[in-house]
Structures are given as C-alpha cells and as structure tokens.
C-alpha cells in the first residue's frame, strides 16, 4: 500500500479563504503536511520576535510633532525587557523619574482634559509601530468632532495596560485610552488593543476598563474600532462609568470603507 505524495483535499479547506486561523490544515498519513508544519514554526517565530522587538518611538513622535500634537516619552518601573516579562507589576507603574516628568507636564499644560491617550509597547511593539499612528489620527478626529479636549500623548516603554491609570490620574484626565500591543498569537503578531477607563486612578482592576481588541488589517479596522470607541466614550461621559457596567451596544455601522481599513469577511459574520 503506497502513501499518497500529496495530502487529500479537505472538503472544508475553502474556509481558509475566510479566516487566518489555523484550520483545515490537511494531513499526510497521521501527520501534518510539511507546509503546515513550517507555517506553524514561522508563526511561532514571528510571535516570539514580536514580544522581544524593541519599541522605537521616534517615527511616532515625529508624526505627532508634524501634526502639532504634544507628546512625552516615559519609562515604566521595569528597567528592561527581561524585567518587564519577569515582573508584570513593574510594567503597571511609572518609574519615579517618569512620574515626576509627567507632573511637570501637567503643571505646564494644565489638567482636567476630557481624554488622555497612552501608547505603550506592551507585548508587541510591532503592533504599535504598524497601527498606533493611524489610530491616534482617528482618535484626534473623533475628539475634534465631539468637542473633547485632549491631553498630550504619553508614550511609555515597557508599559502594561494598568499604567494608563497612573498616567490618567497624574494628568487629571476624565478618561484615559491605552493603545497597547497585545500578546501575539500564531496568526496575529501585530494586534493592537485599546483600553478605555473612566476616572483613571492607581489601583483599579480590569473590571473598570473596556477593551477593543484585535485592531489590525486582518481583524478590526481602524474605522470600526473608532466607531466602537466613540460610543463607549459618549456613554462613559453620560453615565460616569466604564468597565463591566458599560456594554458595547453600538449599532453595527454600514461598511466603513478605506482601502487599508477594510478587514476581510469572515464566516462568523452575517452577510
């Protein structure tokens, strides 16, 4: 009995055209085809690289300054990537010097802004490099449309989600938005997450935050993410809360177009 040189075609392999998830991989005997195995190894390597890639804030700072947006680069209490990965608690707080810098910035620019925006590398600086500038443009446009005041953008090296609480508190902001690189998956090394907190302050838990996840070309488009964010911000200001008490009940918009913004259809969504 001879072993087929090529794997038999799976009847549902066509679903791979609709999702980047690792489905319908096929088989050769009792094993994966060589191509699928190599693709897995590549995806795993890309995820590892995304975690360890150093955050390069210079292009983002240049883009912000070109737009006339004030910004400041700070460091969390984690001194380097190794400590950041070993001590998650240090990534949630600013270094003492950074906190002092932010107090000085607040003294110059004043406080009580409606929205503060933090950009942190998180577990994927690649996601920040690829998507943060575009999302900041969307947030600026949304704030201008709604009449919300914006604090200077705060960039944080070795930051985790909760660092937004300290930043927002020091800036005396009504809300804080954290744009952060999400933990890479095997098909998503560049996924950007967005976290919203009303009346940020040190010590809040994840229950106080709303999350908009998987912002990238193959996931949630910039326009769709901004649509959801606009709804959540308006409701947060109206109801004076965020987190588990605030549900995303935004109506699904008509196609929010833009060549780079339209995410591919998936079989999970209705036509």
Curated annotation (Swiss-Prot):
What is a single molecular function from GO for this protein?
Answer: cobalamin binding
Role of this protein: Catalyzes the deamination of various vicinal amino-alcohols to oxo compounds. Allows this organism to utilize ethanolamine as the sole source of nitrogen and carbon in the presence of external vitamin B12.
Reactions catalysed, semicolon-separated, are: ethanolamine = acetaldehyde + NH4(+)
InterPro entries registered for this protein in UniProt: EutC, EutC_C, EutC_N
Q: Which UniProt keywords apply?
A: Bacterial microcompartment, Cobalamin, Cobalt, Lyase
Q: How is the cofactor bound?
A: Binds between the large and small subunits.
Q: Which NCBIfam families match?
A: PRK05465.1
The protein's name is: Ethanolamine ammonia-lyase small subunit
Its pathway is: Amine and polyamine degradation; ethanolamine degradation
User: Quick one: which gene encodes this?
Assistant: eutC
List the cofactors: adenosylcob(III)alamin
- Annotated adenosylcob(III)alamin binding sites: 161, 182, 211
Name the domain of life: Bacteria
PANTHER family, from UniProt?
A: ETHANOLAMINE AMMONIA-LYASE LIGHT CHAIN, ETHANOLAMINE AMMONIA-LYASE SMALL SUBUNIT
Q: What is its main location?
A: other
Family recorded in the similarity comment: Belongs to the EutC family.
């Amino acid at each position: 009995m001879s072993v087929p040189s090529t794997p038999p075609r799976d009847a549902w392999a066509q679903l791979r055209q609709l999702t980047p998830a690792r489905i319908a991989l096929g088989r050769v005997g009792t094993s994966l085809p060589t191509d699928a195995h190599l693709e897995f190894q590549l995806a795993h390597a890309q995820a590892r690289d995304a975690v360890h890639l150093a955050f390069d804030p210079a292009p983002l700072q240049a883009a912000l300054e070109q737009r006339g947006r004030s910004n400041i680069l700070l460091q969390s209490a984690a001194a380097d990537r190794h400590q950041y990965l070993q001590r998650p608690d240090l990534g949630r707080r600013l270094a003492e010097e950074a906190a002092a810098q932010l107090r000085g910035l607040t003294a110059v620019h004043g406080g009580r802004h409606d929205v503060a925006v933090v950009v942190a590398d998180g577990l994927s600086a690649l996601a920040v490099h690829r998507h943060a500038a575009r999302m900041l443009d969307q947030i600026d446009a949304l704030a201008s449309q709604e009449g919300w005041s914006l604090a200077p953008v705060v960039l944080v090296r070795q930051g985790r989600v909760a660092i937004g609480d300290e930043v927002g508190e020091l800036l005396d902001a009504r809300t804080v938005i954290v744009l952060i690189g999400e933990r890479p998956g095997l098909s998503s090394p560049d996924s950007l997450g967005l976290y919203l907190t009303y009346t940020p302050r040190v010590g809040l838990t994840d229950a106080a935050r709303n999350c908009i996840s998987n912002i990238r070309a193959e996931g949630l488009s910039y326009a769709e993410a901004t649509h959801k964010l606009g709804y959540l911000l308006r409701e947060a200001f109206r109801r004076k809360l965020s987190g588990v008490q605030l549900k995303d009940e935004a109506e699904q918009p008509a196609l929010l177009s833009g060549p780079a913004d339209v995410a591919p259809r998936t079989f999970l969504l209705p036509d």
